């Protein structure tokens, strides 16, 4: 075996598919956004909660029927006691487990918010990741729809706190009970029609994708897509299809409310659902939220299979350019509704709950499109350079660094190979450091430091043509007593901030 064969192979650095690294800019942008969301939730009287990223798989409801192995939608492993655990799929199922497990200690109504990563073991694609952040708020133990109305108002306030103007968003509200009433009215009530009702729900969930014509085919005989694949329909007749499409096609609720009430009159839940929608409309209007902010809209159909009452969705109405270069409406950034059954499956008794979830990554994309994120400037640290490596000199450099930090100024002492001073200035330039502190043996002997304004120096370097003039001018560099270090650095940073404001047209 030759030496080449003996040489161990390098491990290839690679990121798992569907996952991303988050850099400083992304992390700061998310922190800035979530801080504003958190402030709104706190004002509404909600408290934070954190649950583990792992839950027992059955708590997430992710076992296939007649199977002892979790389905493919979750990342799972077996504990040493052979119980299956999975990374959480959303933040709602862990909340339900927490409430059920601590029910006797929790004060109802329980108002909580959570932010954290969720995981989907699904095929990744453009903009589709296996790990992403959600920010949820929920009220558990509040049966009245006033809790749902409050959620809608909180969603609207959150979007405005993030800088999204009225007219650029709307929170749309529907009610699962009304749809149940419509389905009952067309003959799809009863347990024996559960499968057909599910097919109807799945068909109308495609309204945004296929439009009314495509949904009509899915409600009726079926639909063939462009590739020739056929999807079997729900088997409704034309009269049934027309009533379903009337419901999901309502654009002006006030104009259609009486006809809708007539359609669901006599059904077990439909009339109750219409009454709840009207109640929500009255509550939000009384609180000053007009239809430009919160709108009753039966065309909201996403998630109706999951929710048991009101369902709501926050949509952004401004245009963005998609990956094909087309102008499209940005669309949904969050939604939720009433899910009275989720906690109840642990308890064996009814536990009403309502809440919503914000897709943090998607909302961050929207805010970047609007120029509402990342505006908070982050100043890179002042660099204290190292001219000498003896203990006394290092002690002086470290003290300067700590003095700057104690004054609230970001600062770092150079930790690389200090013997090549040019590399220190290159590091400062690439890092974007605003100021460099320099003290050699001569300066240390006289108790002074050199302070170099790197931003001004970079600007002036374009105006001085030869090295001799540059050295003579000692561009943007001052010598001050060590005792004046902090004050002088603060003065330079303030001047740089003023320059940035002028450049941005703020003054």
Swiss-Prot record:
UniProt keyword Cytoplasm, yes or no: yes
One GO term of the biological process aspect: histidyl-tRNA aminoacylation
Family: Belongs to the class-II aminoacyl-tRNA synthetase family.
Protein name: Histidine--tRNA ligase
Gene assigned in the entry: hisS
One CC-aspect GO term: cytoplasm
Principal location: cytoplasm
Subcellular location: Cytoplasm
Enzyme class: ligase
GO MF annotation: an example: ATP binding
